From Swiss-Prot:
Compartments, record wording: Cytoplasm
Region Domain I, interacts with DnaA modulators, annotated ranges: 1-79
Gene assigned in the entry: dnaA
Domain of life where this protein originates: Bacteria
Protein name: Chromosomal replication initiator protein DnaA
One Gene Ontology cellular component annotation held by this UniProt entry: cytoplasm
Pfam families linked to this entry: Bac_DnaA (PF00308), Bac_DnaA_C (PF08299), DnaA_N (PF11638)
Entry note about domains: Domain I is involved in oligomerization and binding regulators, domain II is flexibile and of varying length in different bacteria, domain III forms the AAA+ region, while domain IV binds dsDNA.
């Protein structure tokens, strides 16, 4: 594959996937997921990574993540790449700074650059995302008007972040002076903690309120965190009342996020919410054709059809297979049906299977030395209730199963019972280190079995 075919986003997703499979969930969420790959220097084989703060930077140094990055990079690209990690911050309240430079505050907020590859031009519209795309385009052209807030929800790997950042890129194209801020929910919470420690909460609030467009990824991470929910509620109200735009992504609808304050649920739903579903075959084929045009290589329709037929999970895996295919071209091997089939066979061996509810129930039951019948039955004694709630929590965090369906899997319990159980575990792991470690170990064990 020629260097011009290199897809940084797919490359980084492949590395993140290997980190996720080989470390604890909490460590991954704290130290790997918040990092963004923004630039590749193919001549020197380096990749520029953005970290949201110094704490993440220190974790990379202490955790030997650089060496792991290089190992996983070779797995993904069959070549050596070295990461260059930088902390990206922006001085608070950019509007005031441009005018008079009045603020001498030490407060800085996370400010990621928008991914320039995430545009409407590189987005493929299909039945699975048509409504969400229509709303996103409308918001990019007239922010703060009809759809405010706009919530885009759906399972991981379907393109929520791409569509959300496309809104930001389009608005900057139409209004170059517009202030657009993209953050993850974890970034927001980290910034708030830093502001409190530095006694700069007023600057924190000003920084987040003085925007034309606020893009917030993974809003479900607010679950069970009342203190952060209150602050986000206040900022949310200020932005929407000023007729500025908020766009959010989530795995599920707000009403299905356990531990989310009713006021926030109401506010989040005052605009519109559209889901992105798994792409159908025509959309998957169109995505592959779009990618081949993007990297400038010709792949016959039969080969693309084979890939589109066999990978029906999500866009991320589809692009991963395509990227592997183009890597073969870099090695001088032909891109054809035969080689595509070999790639798919390899992916079928290495790709994780779907985690099922029975898998989780059995793993938890074995770990706590209780029977499956007791775990899903009516017993309410403490030695049964805790593992039952742990199982519910793991199902909620490791799968896309809705609360009602989880309730059905536990003897037909009501969804509010499931919500209470998952909220209780989320609260407990904030203070009970032993339980937190046990759940992380269970999560790792479940993923390894799947």
């Amino acid at each position: 594959m020629k260097d011009s075919y290199f897809d940084l986003n797919t490359f980084w997703k492949g590395i993140q996937g290997r980190f996720a499979a080989n470390m604890g969930e909490t460590a991954y969420e704290n130290w790997i997921k918040p990092v963004r790959a923004v630039k590749v220097d193919l001549a020197n084989r380096t990749v520029e990574l953005q970290a949201p703060n110094d704490i993440v930077m220190q974790a990379w140094d202490n955790g030997n993540y650089t060496a792991k990055f290089m190992e996983y990079a070779y797995d993904v690209a069959h070549d050596f790449f070295k990461p260059e990690l930088k902390v990206i911050k922006v001085v608070a309240n950019p509007v005031n700074n441009q005018k008079s430079n009045q603020s001498n505050s030490d407060f800085v907020a996370t400010d990621y650059q928008l991914n320039q590859n995430f545009t409407f031009d590189t987005w493929v519209i299909g039945d699975a995302n048509e409504l969400a795309t229509s709303a996103a385009m409308a918001v990019s052209e007239q922010p703060g008007r009809q759809y405010n807030p706009l919530l885009i929800y759906g399972s991981s790997g379907l393109g929520k972040t791409h569509l959300m950042e496309a809104i930001g890129n389009r608005l900057k194209e139409l209004q170059p002076d517009a202030i657009v801020r993209y953050i993850t929910t974890d970034d927001f919470m980290n910034d708030w903690v830093n502001a409190i420690s530095k006694k700069t909460t007023a600057d924190f609030t000003s920084t987040y309120e003085n925007v034309d467009l606020l893009l917030v990824d993974d809003i479900q991470m607010l679950q069970g965190k009342d203190r952060f929910q209150e602050e986000f509620f206040n900022i949310f109200n200020k932005i929407t009342k000023s007729q500025k735009q908020i766009v959010m992504t989530s795995d599920v609808l707000p009403k299905d996020i356990p531990g989310l304050n009713a006021r926030l649920v109401s506010r989040f739903m005052q605009g519109v919410a559209y889901d992105i579903q798994k792409p159908d075959f025509p959309t998957r084929l169109a995505i592959l054709k779009n990618k081949s045009e993007e990297v400038g290589i010709s792949i016959d329709n039969q080969t693309l059809t084979l890939i589109a037929e066999q990978i029906d999970t999500n866009v991320r895996e589809l692009e991963g297979a395509f990227n592997t295919l183009t890597l073969m071209a870099r090695a001088g091997r032909p891109i054809n049906v035969s080689n595509a089939q070999k790639i798919l066979e390899h992916l079928n061996i290495t790709r994780q299977k779907v985690i099922t509810l029975p898998d989780i129930q059995k793993t938890v039951a074995d770990d706590y030395n209780v029977s499956i019948n007791d775990l899903i039955g009516k017993k309410r004694n403490s030695d049964i209730v805790l593992p039952r709630q742990v199982a519910m929590y793991l199902i909620r965090t490791l799968t896309d199963t809705s609360l009602p369906k989880i309730g059905q899997a536990f003897g037909g319990r009501d969804h509010t019972t499931v919500m209470h159980g998952t909220e209780k575990i989320a609260d407990l792991i904030e203070t009970d280190y032993a339980l937190k470690q046990r759940i992380e170990n269970l999560s790792t064990k479940i993923k390894e079995k799947s």
